[in-house]
């Protein structure tokens, strides 16, 4: 054990000269491995008297601890130097553009709904909603639609049973609103509606917006003025607009509204009319005192006309190439 101090000094010198972690590990094995110089010193204890062995073992362990501490310190130095060298080599060009984060956008039909709600909100209309699973009273009977009307046929309506169905229009919201509150009433009712049809211009589910005003002294002139302002605001053009006589069971007189397209042809955009007296009576409103007008329009239809979309089904196919056009 007389040369123990020399072994420690030799180990520390080798540690300080190690140029990388691999070389340092070789030094560790040489001095502290199973057959290392300091490890083998423990075998000399058997040559000592029993009473001297504990003190001698403590001295050897102290020497090993000094070498281990030197190894740890040098390893930290080498790892730090390697990290600094790697960071210096891996320079970052801060002038390069970053990765672009894709922002989402509103669906074109949602944009149309928001635009219409904003316009009518400025006119004092509030948004009303109702159930999509409706009963035949609110969807048909209260709206003056008789039992023999084609809309009640199985091929046009999704029926659950004899009285429950997927609503074919949001007009049921008007009925529920008129039964729940007295005039004056001024609402719009956006929502999903369902009809058994599917082709280039029809889908089984689509979005509809209906409007309703009930008050005293409401006339067809009020209806025409409101819809003129709305259509010119929505399309952002001084459109040529015409009201064409039509028939709806729940309005009298009734009309369909057309706008002149860029191709010189009339395009139907919505239906409207004065609320039928029978509808007012069905909800407990006196038609001798109050009158009103109502209108309804398909959101997909208006969106197609506004953005020049030719196939209604494009709105439901989730094709990002199509949807990104409307950001």
Curated annotation (Swiss-Prot):
GO terms for cellular component: cytoplasm. This is Phenylalanine--tRNA ligase alpha subunit. Tetramer of two alpha and two beta subunits. One of its GO terms (molecular function) is magnesium ion binding. GO terms for biological process: phenylalanyl-tRNA aminoacylation. It comes from Shigella dysenteriae serotype 1 (strain Sd197). InterPro entries: aa-tRNA-synth_II, aa-tRNA-synth_II/BPL/LPL, Phe-tRNA-synth_IIc_asu, Phe-tRNA_ligase_II_N, Phe_tRNA_ligase_alpha1_bac, Phenylalanyl-tRNA_Synthase, tRNA-bd_arm. PANTHER family: PHENYLALANINE--TRNA LIGASE, MITOCHONDRIAL, PHENYLALANYL-TRNA SYNTHETASE. Belongs to the class-II aminoacyl-tRNA synthetase family. Phe-tRNA synthetase alpha subunit type 1 subfamily. It catalyses: tRNA(Phe) + L-phenylalanine + ATP = L-phenylalanyl-tRNA(Phe) + AMP + diphosphate + H(+). It holds the Pfam family Phe_tRNA-synt_N. Its cofactor is Mg(2+). Mg(2+) binds at residue 252. Keywords: Aminoacyl-tRNA synthetase, ATP-binding, Cytoplasm, Ligase, Magnesium, Metal-binding, Nucleotide-binding, Protein biosynthesis. Coiled coil: none annotated. It is an enzyme of class 6 (ligase). Binds 2 magnesium ions per tetramer. It is found in: Cytoplasm. Its EC number is 6.1.1.20.
């Amino acid at each position: 054990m007389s040369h123990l101090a020399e072994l420690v000094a030799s180990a520390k010198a080798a540690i300080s000269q190690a140029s990388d972690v691999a070389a340092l590990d070789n030094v560790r094995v040489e001095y502290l491995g199973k057959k290392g110089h300091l490890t083998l010193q423990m075998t000399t204890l058997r040559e000592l008297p029993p009473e001297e062995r504990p003190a001698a073992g403590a001295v050897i362990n102290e020497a090993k601890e000094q070498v281990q501490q030197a190894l740890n310190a040098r390893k930290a130095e080498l790892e730090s130097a390697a990290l600094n060298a790697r960071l210096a080599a891996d320079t970052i060009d801060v002038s390069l553009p970053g990765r672009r984060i894709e922002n989402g956008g509103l669906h074109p039909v949602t944009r149309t709904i928001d635009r219409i709600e904003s316009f009518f909100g400025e006119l004092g209309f509030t948004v009303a909603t109702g159930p999509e699973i409706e009963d035949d009273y609110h969807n048909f009977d209260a709206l003056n639609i008789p039992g023999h009307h084609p809309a009640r046929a199985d091929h046009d309506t999704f029926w659950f049973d004899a009285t429950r169905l997927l609503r074919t229009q949001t007009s049921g919201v008007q009925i529920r609103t008129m039964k729940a509150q007295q005039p004056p009433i001024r609402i719009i009712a956006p929502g999903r509606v369902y009809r058994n049809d599917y082709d280039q211009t029809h889908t089984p589910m689509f979005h509809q917006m209906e409007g309703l005003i009930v008050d005293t002294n409401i006339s067809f002139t009020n209806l025409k003025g409101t819809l003129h302002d709305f259509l010119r605001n929505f399309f952002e053009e001084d459109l040529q607009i015409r009201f064409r006589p039509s028939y709806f069971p729940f309005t009298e007189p009734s009309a369909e509204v057309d706008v002149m397209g860029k191709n010189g042809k009339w395009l139907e955009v919505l239906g409207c009319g004065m609320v039928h007296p029978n509808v007012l009576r069905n909800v407990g409103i006196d038609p001798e005192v109050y009158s009103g007008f109502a209108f309804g329009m398909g959101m997909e239809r208006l969106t197609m006309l506004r953005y020049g979309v030719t196939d209604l089904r494009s709105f439901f196919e989730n094709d990002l190439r199509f949807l990104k056009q409307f950001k």
